[in-house]
């Protein structure tokens, strides 16, 4: 597991650890410790692969039967996220797994990105606006409560920095960053549909890069859906414009149906 996967796994595990007790029970959250790797699950949404996934699995298939039994016991499907070209791909293929969505992993230092003019302002979210932040994130996911309280909890959690973009007083975009020593991960970014194409995500990327530098981070990681038919999506283009470079493709593998 390299630094890009390591900080992603750190972010996901700390996100699950941040869930308030009522959210933990309402969503039936669980984590399976696999040593350097982990499986995590949201039982209330058994087909939601983002939160029913395995990260950090190394070459070999020793843990796969345990993982399969665990997700089956929870009634959830899942995805195994691994780097394209890893030996484990052959093992998964032999077990009847199939390719799902591919994500591009990106990396960069904490040098400031080019300044882009925007009519929007960005602000780090503290306790007093955490509820508003969570409400918008939940709306972007289309899940509502209690997802709002889960994301709101990150705004005051150590090793996290949550930012929002505002159109005057209206909160229209959200994004989060997780820091662990000299590594940082950027994710959970989105903009309300009626406010897109106004530079919100570019501004939020810049704000998080600055925060990462202030926190002592030296290497930043993020990921977004890979090119489709060779064409990058808006998120992919935003990340490149912010100075990230493509590292490699992370493939999601789905178990046999």
Region locations from a protein language model:
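A conserved beta-strand-loop-helix scaffold within acyl/acetyltransferase catalytic domains
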Residues: 143-194
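Conserved acetyl-CoA binding element of GNAT-fold acetyltransferases
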Residues: 45-58, 182-193, 252
